């Protein structure tokens, strides 16, 4: 899989923190997020899923993720936004790759990306969270084009 190393700025994000199997929690989290964004007339910059754990090491019921939108730096949480978190994705060096997800198979591109990056002789993966941004509306299109971000540092 082709990827590039880029310096990313921090992102201010707002949305929902979820715990459990990602195939359920990400979908549930985005349903909640869409209702909140529509109901509060939030203007998102990007739609993002943030992943905190390695699914090969953490039991599915303990996997953590955030389903969020990136927002302007001066964003203020609207009243009656129970359960919504406002936090940041750290800036820094990230390996980035674009993939098309079909049949709801988000895992395969991530595994391919990690496999390619683990062979990199100049960069190593760090322990900060990974995330993906959505480049289209997969519900309407029947597939998702995503950009994946894995935090790295020079070896």
UniProtKB/Swiss-Prot annotation:
InterPro entries: AraC_E-bd (IPR010499), DNA_gyrase_inhibitor (IPR050908), DNA_gyrase_inhibitor_GyrI (IPR024911), GyrI-like (IPR029442), Reg_factor_effector_dom_sf (IPR011256)
GO molecular function terms noted in the UniProt entry: DNA topoisomerase type II (double strand cut, ATP-hydrolyzing) inhibitor activity
Superkingdom, taxonomy of origin: Bacteria
The entry's keywords: Cytoplasm, Stress response
Pfam family name, one: GyrI-like
Residue intervals passing through the bilayer: none
Compartmental location: Cytoplasm
Primary location: cytoplasm
One Gene Ontology cellular component annotation held by this UniProt entry: cytoplasm
Biological role: Inhibits the supercoiling activity of DNA gyrase. Acts by inhibiting DNA gyrase at an early step, prior to (or at the step of) binding of DNA by the gyrase. It protects cells against toxins that target DNA gyrase, by inhibiting activity of these toxins and reducing the formation of lethal double-strand breaks in the cell.
Family, per entry: Belongs to the DNA gyrase inhibitor family.
HAMAP family: DNA_gyrase_inhibitor
Assembly, per entry: Interacts with DNA gyrase.
PANTHER family cross-referenced by the UniProt entry: DNA GYRASE INHIBITOR (PTHR40055:SF2), TRANSCRIPTIONAL REGULATOR YGIV-RELATED (PTHR40055)
Name listed for the protein in its UniProt record: DNA gyrase inhibitor
Organism listed in the record: Salmonella arizonae (strain ATCC BAA-731 / CDC346-86 / RSK2980)
Gene: sbmC
